[in-house]
Amino acid sequence: MSDGGAPTVEFLRHGGRIAMAHRGFTSFRLPMNSMGAFQEAAKLGFRYIETDVRATRDGVAVILHDRRLAPGVGLSGAVDRLDWRDVRKAQLGAGQSIPTLEDLLTALPDMRVNIDIKAASAIEPTVNVIERCNAHNRVLIGSFSERRRRRALRLLTKRVASSAGTGALLAWLTARPLGSRAYAWRMMRDIDCVQLPSRLGGVPVITPARVRGFHAAGRQVHAWTVDEPDVMHTLLDMDVDGIITDRADLLRDVLIARGEWDGA
């Protein structure tokens, strides 16, 4: 396996494949993005998890994918129009409530957390938690929005790992002429890794040539969200640096079979 270039940020310094549990591991009974799911991933030996952060109306960074609360949690509405004192009462099922980002970083101090900032209102609350927990070395900031990602990086007082937003990735993937390719690399100058789907609309996105190209530029390549063992093997054979999965149990089995599991 290539090292994808020497990582300059602690988050990516691992020495092996990065196995990342997407919103934790449910064990087929726990809600995604719950503290129980994160703890299940830790029990499996995972050292990396991916999660989503939004903010309540009063500025508390919470672990939540969708803006609107799901039916059946005992509360309705958009999380950014509700205060934390109310959101904390929502029940996700299996005895789980909505955790805060600070809950997660505090409860699992050795876990590295890939944070997808889902809304502009969550930027400052996320930054404040990272600063308060001094968690710069164990978080990665990502977002589908380049504007959100870059604003978070500007507000943080220390360097953190970052993955490319959709705009930067599209610029790189569609660049053809030399001038366009130079622009694409400028778009990605402040990122440490790319996190890509293996396929998009049936078209391969991660290819051996692209993996080699990103490695040559010193960027790691992480594939998401991969739940099939045969696809995991194919991507690992392409030399991807990490895989993000809903099936942490299967990824663990695949890495064990390849002799590449070291507690993720």
Swiss-Prot record:
Binding site for a divalent metal cation: 50, 52, 65
Chemical reaction(s) catalysed: a sn-glycero-3-phosphodiester + H2O = an alcohol + sn-glycerol 3-phosphate + H(+)
Keywords: Hydrolase, Metal-binding
EC category: hydrolase
Required cofactor(s): a divalent metal cation
Recorded name of the encoding gene: glpQ2
Catalytic residues (UniProt): 22, 65
Biological process (GO), any one: lipid metabolic process
Domain called GP-PDE: residue spans: 17-255
GO molecular function, one term: phosphoric diester hydrolase activity
Functional description taken from the UniProt entry: Glycerophosphodiester phosphodiesterase hydrolyzes glycerophosphodiesters into glycerol-3-phosphate (G3P) and the corresponding alcohol.
Superkingdom of the source species: Bacteria
Coiled coil (UniProt feature): none
Enzyme Commission identifier(s): 3.1.4.46
InterPro entries per the UniProt record, alphabetical: GP_PDE_dom (IPR030395), PLC-like_Pdiesterase_TIM-brl (IPR017946)
Pfam families: GDPD
Organism listed in the record: Mycobacterium tuberculosis (strain ATCC 25618 / H37Rv)
Name listed for the protein in its UniProt record: Probable glycerophosphodiester phosphodiesterase 2
Family indicated by similarity: Belongs to the glycerophosphoryl diester phosphodiesterase family.
